[in-house]
């Protein structure tokens, strides 16, 4: 009661600033004796959420032109009436009209988060309004696993850490047609990784404040080479012939060719060898009898070696369209001779009749 009389006396003597400070002191727990509190009528509490970087306007209104106001942030005085106590250039008082005493904070940051109190000193009793400002922060991935190369069968852990307010949720996605969804979380564990699980993994952090933050990790899976196919086309003496060997492996395998036990080299005896990352083509520019035989394609990388063989044989009677046993061949020639005989008799008959 003595405090209220002192405040009113200060107001009556036009020392309103002292009155405001005394009323603010009543709002601060540090100014009160232990175990005591002061409850003001017409007090209100509001919550306000603002995205980081935006402008926050904390509303407060004076009852009439004679009343005075003040703004506090925790125990720090920001404004007392029209006097600015804060050195922060981002804060100001809104002056849309005589009753408006709203606090404006430009380019809000996480350090602005917290409670704010507007105290209005009238001729009768002080009125307070409290606003809790929550600064929302868009998600930001600040740490993610580097691109990596591992061997098939290895256990792999991918890491994706992000900040934001509210705390962002983390989700993973394997960028591939046959991808399966993963459980959400900062860490993605892949046990016994296979070659099909190689590729890019996308980490997405989102909290509905702004667009998700997305980063990617590339995972290369090494595996020993395999030969998927080896085949040749029709081989005719005097013409070109080729054998194609299709393989796979990471790192890409190196290809070699052998005829029997003998290694073949590019340019040797009319042989051309073309090697690609997943294919090797052996071409014989002018096939002769000595080129026929068994050819072996060998694919090797640092994880292993594999091979496949294919015989290169001379053309058979099949290429002329006549196949079968001796009896079948005899029947075919008998049919041709019989048709020839009938044709000769027909022409002889016509000659006699004429």
Curated annotation (Swiss-Prot):
Glycans are attached at residues 73, 155, 275, 286, 294, 307. The gene is NEGR1. Residues 38-134, 139-221, 225-313 form the Ig-like C2-type domain. Disulfide bonds join 60-118, 160-203, 245-297. Residues 1-37 form the signal peptide. GO terms for biological process: brain development; cell-cell adhesion; cholesterol homeostasis; fat cell differentiation; feeding behavior; lipid droplet formation; locomotory behavior; neuron projection morphogenesis. Residues 325-354 form a propeptide. The modification Phosphotyrosine is found at residue 187. Transmembrane segments: none annotated. A lipid is attached at residue 324 (GPI-anchor amidated glycine). It comes from Homo sapiens. GO terms for cellular component: dendrite; extracellular region; neuronal cell body; plasma membrane; postsynaptic density; side of membrane. May be involved in cell-adhesion. May function as a trans-neural growth-promoting factor in regenerative axon sprouting in the mammalian brain. Coiled coil: none annotated. InterPro entries: Ig-like_dom (IPR007110), Ig-like_dom_sf (IPR036179), Ig-like_fold (IPR013783), Ig_I-set (IPR013098), Ig_sub (IPR003599), Ig_sub2 (IPR003598), IgLON_domain (IPR050876). Gene3D superfamilies: Immunoglobulins (2.60.40.10). This is Neuronal growth regulator 1. Pfam families: I-set (PF07679), Ig_3 (PF13927). The lineage of its organism: Eukaryota, Metazoa, Chordata, Craniata, Vertebrata. Belongs to the immunoglobulin superfamily. IgLON family. It is found in: Cell membrane. It is a lipid-anchor; GPI-anchor. PROSITE patterns: IG_LIKE (PS50835). Keywords: Cell adhesion, Cell membrane, Disulfide bond, Glycoprotein, GPI-anchor, Immunoglobulin domain, Lipoprotein, Membrane, Phosphoprotein, Repeat, Signal. The keyword Endoplasmic reticulum does not apply.
